[in-house]
Amino acid sequence: PVGAFVANAKFAKAMEPGDHGSTYGGNPLVTAAVSTVFDILKKDSIVENCKEVSEYLLEELDKVVKDYDCVVGHRGLGLMQGIVLNVPAKKYVQALLDEGVIVVTAGEKVIRLLPPLVITKEHVDEFITKLRKVLA
């Protein structure tokens, strides 16, 4: 684990060594790993991909909302989305799992999506096809 935070001068002056931190959180190995992750995120345009694919996902989810009475909407941020139903989500989650799609419930009536950052539009298409299949 590793973390960082920024404090203005007023709060920084009030802190002493040991007030905030982790025993293992800032060692050289961990910081090297974090640095490498940031390099990969930049080199592979991961953030840009997330923005592009999340916009596509939202467009496709909007279509699902219009096409199925049991789907009342979706909510979330970027790729992290909840598909809001007006019926219990459990059977749909199980059906999606049976189709090889990893989702979970978030409360009784929400199917939660939390795809990897390297998701593609083709993955979204596959998900939407399987979602439509289980909703039918």
Feature annotation, model-predicted:
Residues 1-136:
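Conserved N-terminal phosphate-binding loop of PLP-dependent enzymes in the Aspartate aminotransferase
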